[in-house]
């Protein structure tokens, strides 16, 4: 980021602005127009209904099969992305499995693969099952038996199961180390598709992956399986393509809205990432019933990105102080106090939330927009504090930094906004979220520390000293490497908190909690290998976006 001297009409003086050199959008006008082929969509929908009935019958029949067969069927249906059609049936099956043998005494649990799949599925569905099920695979010294190293499928699912661990579950920590070591050794010698699955899993665990991304990958892998279920595979392909049509339609709406705002021309200092913003929303919820929610959340992410860059990459303290105050007052009459460039984003922000209120009033839910506004005011107030630190060269203590930075992670705002378009989200859910429950704080912490690790070098190059890493280094007199290790440790702890908070009993439904879990998953994918995939989407996000909203699956 190179400083630039510009003349401001707001105040007759030369102002040095740290103008950012963000790369342009990768997508141009690619997504601005899309029309659904209704004939194809109708054809897909009709066949899906038939396949849906057949799959439901298959699930019912599975109740009379072995435990291993039940679990494998549920796992395949979930990984193919069609489980949302059968939520009640799957929940009933898992509940029966859990209640029928709560101590896992069935002989089938002596199989590592069966035990691992069962443990992960039950944990992911909120059952607080004990990891002691894996003690039967350890020797007298409490070490995993070396004889297991030939069971690659079992090791792969043990690895996946280890990622749902919570605090003080040492056996799962050991399971992770044990499985990774043997899978890495075995990977070069395996045949496809198992070799591909192992390599992919070691790069991105299932539990921490974005569901829609993982579904697209698994469909291609499952097609290579020798003993695949052709009915389920065809169902998954049709459903993926039909849902993709809806996603393309929504992205077209968001892209046109973004183009009409013309921020690329009027606010050239800011990131042009509308497509990446929509990608995030597919990570939060991909199912068709969340269409309105996705569009609302995508627009909010795009808007907060503009506000963030205004504070971080362009504004000066005097301007930012007035901008912050105007947003706290949330009144269009405040616009005349602002410099010209700030008037643009201020009006767009207020207009957006007015649109939300009008849209939600149709369902009698306009009152919940208040909670999203309050989160917007909160994050802007915290942005101002960070902006002052940067401009004035102030370095806070790490505790002072984190107390402010959890809000600027954006996850308080985005989680609240993610509920706006969900008809099932009640005022009580927003009230619960406003208390900053443990799972929300964990998510914000995860987002903050992972972002800080990924952006440290860039921010250091801009002269930013009030970063989390720098604050920790100064407070504790340690090296950059040690500080980053500490922040990674904080991320690991946050993940355990998230995993723990989705286990029953829970204060809200799994539908509500899953949005928070999915936001955590987005961080794991977007900042893979300490890269800021949002600011620099070329390597990290571009392939996923192409897979999700450009390329359909060959039927």
From Swiss-Prot:
The keyword Magnesium applies. It comes from the Eukaryota. Its main location: cytoplasm. It is found in: Cytoplasm. Induction: By elicitor from R.solani. A motif (DDXXD motif) lies at residues 308-312. Mg(2+) 1 binds at residues 308, 312. Belongs to the terpene synthase family. Tpsa subfamily. This is Vetispiradiene synthase 1.
């Amino acid at each position: 980021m190179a400083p630039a001297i510009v003349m401001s009409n707001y105040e007759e003086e030369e102002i040095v602005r740290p103008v950012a050199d963000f790369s342009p959008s990768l997508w141009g006008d690619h997504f601005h127009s899309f029309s659904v082929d209704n004939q194809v969509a109708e054809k897909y929908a009709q066949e899906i209904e038939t396949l849906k009935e057949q799959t439901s019958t298959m699930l019912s029949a599975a109740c009379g099969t072995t435990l291993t067969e039940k679990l494998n069927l549920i796992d395949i249906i979930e990984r193919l992305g069609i489980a949302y059609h059968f939520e009640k049936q799957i929940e009933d099956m898992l509940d029966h499995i859990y209640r029928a043998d709560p101590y896992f005494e069935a002989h089938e649990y002596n199989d590592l693969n069966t035990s691992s799949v069962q443990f992960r599925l039950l944990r992911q569905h909120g059952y607080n099952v004990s990891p002691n099920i894996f003690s039967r695979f350890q020797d007298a010294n409490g070490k995993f038996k070396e004889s297991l190293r030939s069971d690659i499928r079992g090791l792969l699912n043990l690895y996946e199961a280890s990622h749902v661990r919570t605090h003080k579950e040492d056996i799962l920590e050991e399971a992770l180390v044990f499985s990774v070591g043997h899978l890495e050794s075995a990977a070069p010698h395996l045949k496809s598709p198992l070799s591909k699955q192992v390599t992919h899993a070691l790069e991105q665990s299932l539990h921490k992956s974005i569901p829609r991304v993982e579904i697209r990958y698994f469909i291609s892998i499952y097609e290579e399986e020798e003993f695949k279920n052709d009915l389920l595979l065809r169902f998954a392909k049709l459903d993926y393509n039909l849902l993709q049509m809806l996603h393309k339609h929504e992205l077209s709406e968001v892209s046109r809205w973004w183009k009409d705002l013309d921020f690329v021309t009027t606010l050239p200092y800011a990131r042009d990432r509308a497509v990446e913003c929509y990608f995030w929303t597919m990570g939060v919820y991909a199912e068709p019933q969340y269409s309105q929610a996705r569009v609302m959340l995508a627009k909010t992410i795009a808007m907060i990105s503009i506000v963030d860059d205004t504070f971080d990459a362009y504004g000066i303290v005097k301007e930012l102080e007035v901008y912050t105050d105007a947003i706290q007052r949330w009144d269009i009459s405040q616009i005349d106090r602002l410099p010209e460039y700030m008037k643009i984003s201020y009006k767009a922000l207020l207009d957006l939330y007015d649109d939300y209120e009008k849209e939600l009033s149709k369902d009698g839910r306009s009152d919940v927009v208040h909670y999203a506004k309050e989160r917007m005011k909160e994050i802007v107030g915290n942005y101002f504090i960070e902006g002052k630190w940067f401009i004035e060269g102030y370095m806070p203590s790490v505790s002072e930094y984190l107390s402010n930075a959890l809000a600027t992670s954006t996850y308080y705002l985005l989680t609240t906004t993610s509920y706006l378009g969900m008809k099932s989200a009640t005022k009580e859910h927003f009230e619960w979220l406003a208390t900053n429950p443990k799972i929300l704080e964990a998510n914000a912490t995860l987002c903050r520390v992972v972002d800080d690790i990924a952006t440290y070098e860039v921010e250091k190059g801009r002269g930013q000293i009030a970063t989390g890493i720098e604050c920790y280094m100064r407070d504790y007199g340690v090296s950059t490497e040690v500080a980053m290790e500490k922040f990674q440790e904080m991320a690991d702890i946050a993940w355990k908190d998230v995993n723990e908070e989705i286990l029953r009993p829970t204060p809200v439904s799994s539908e509500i909690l899953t949005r928070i879990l999915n936001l955590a998953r987005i961080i794991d994918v977007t900042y893979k290998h300490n890269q800021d995939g949002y600011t620099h989407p070329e390597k990290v996000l571009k392939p996923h976006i192409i897979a999700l909203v450009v390329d359909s699956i060959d039927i």
